[in-house]
Amino acid sequence: MKSRFLKAAFALVSACTLMACTPEKENNAAQDAAKTAAPATEAAQQTKDENMNKLTLTAEWDKVFPKSDKVEHSKVTFKNHFGIELAADMFVPKDTSLKVNGKFPAIAVSGPFGAVKEQSSGLYAQQMAERGFLTIAFDPSFTGESGGEPRYMNSPDINTEDFMASVDFLSTRDNVDPERIGIIGICGWGGMAINAAGIDTRVKATVASTMYDMSRVTANGYFDSANNADARNEARKALMAQRTKDFKNGTYDLAGGVVDPLPDDAPYFVKDYYAYYKTPRGYHKRSLNSNKGWAASAGTSLMNTKLLAYADEIRNPVLIIHGEKAHSRYFGEGAFEKMTGKKANVPAKLDATKNWSKTVGNKELLVIPGASHVDLYDNLEKIPFEKLNEFFKTNLK
C-alpha cells in the first residue's frame, strides 16, 4: 500500500515530491514509471507546444463549468517581471453594487497545482464575480495558455511572481480600486498565494483553499515521512540525474498526470483526483493533471525554498479553508500555526451541521465537515462561497 500510495502521489504532484518521500528502491521504480509514462518522443511534443513563444488564446467557452449570465467574460494577457506573458480569463460583474467611485474590488485566482484556468480557478473567479468582484483566473507560467519555456515547469519564485503580476495588472485598470485587491490560491497555489501575500503589500486579503505547501511536501515527502537530510540528498541526486538526461536528450520527460487506469485499491484521494481530472466533470485538454503531468525535473528549487518562511510577517487578513477529510489538511494547519504562533487544534470529529473555525487576530482557519481535498475544487455544496464573499467584502472595503 505504501508503494502504491507514493507512486500515486508521484503522478499527481511531481517527480521531486515522490523522490523526496521514498527510499532509493522506490525512487528507481518511480523513475521507471516516469519513463514509461512519457517516452522521449512524446515528451518532445509535450514540452514544445504552441504557447512557448506566442500566446494562442481560445475564443470559445471551453471551461468545465457553465457560463454565468451574471458576468461579462473576456480573455486578457499581461507580463510578469520575468518577461513571461500570462493568459487569464477576466470576469466583470453586471452587479455594480460593490463599485465605489466607479471602481470594483478585484480578486486574482490560480490553481490547483497542475490545473488550468478553465477548471477550478475559473469557477472560483466566476462565482466571486457573481458576488460583485472583478476577477481574473490566470494560467501560471509554463502552463495552459500562458507563455514560458520549457513547458510544464514550476518555480516558487516565478509562480509567486505570477500572483504579483496579476496584482500589477489589476491595480492599473481604470475600473479597479488598487486599494481593494485580494488573491485566492487553490491547492498548490494556496502556498504560492500566502508567499505572495508575504511580499506584496498591495494584497489586502488572501484566501488559501484546500492548500498544499509545495515546498514542504517536496522537501519532506507526504506527511513529512522523509524529513531528513539523507532522504533529501537521495532525492537531489535523482533530480540531478533527470536534469542531465533531459539536457542530453534535448527534451523533458514528463512525470505523468493522474494515474490511469485507476487501480481498485487506490487511496481515496487518488480516486478523488481521478474523478475530477479524468472524467467530464473536470477533464481539460490543457490540464497537466488531466494528461501527462509536469516535467519530471519540475520543481527542483522547491526542495530548498521554504514558501512560508515569512508567513508570520503577513499583516493583512488571511483565510485558510480545508476539508475535514482532506489528506492535505495538515498543510493548512501548518500555515495557520506559522502565521499565528498558535496550534490549530482541530477537533478529531467535527459537528456535521456547521463549519469549524479558529481565528487569531486577522488569520482564520476554516474546516468544512465531511469535505475532501477535491470537494473544494468544484463542489458548490462544500465550497463556502458566502464565507469568501463575507471575507472579501469585509477586508476589501
Positions of PLM-derived features:
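The serine-hydrolase catalytic nucleophile loop
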Residues: K103, G114-Q126, P140, G332
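N-terminal cap/lid segment of alpha/beta-hydrolase-fold proteins
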Residues: N51-G102, Y377
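Alpha/beta-hydrolase active-site loop
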Residues: M153-D174
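Short beta-strand/loop motif that positions the catalytic acidic residue
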Residues: I314, I320-H322
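Conserved alpha/beta-hydrolase
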Residues: Q127-G147
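Short beta-strand element of the alpha/beta-hydrolase
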Residues: V100-P112
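Alpha/beta-hydrolase-fold enzymes
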Residues: I194-T279
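Catalytic histidine-centered segment of alpha/beta-hydrolase-like enzymes
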Residues: I368-K382
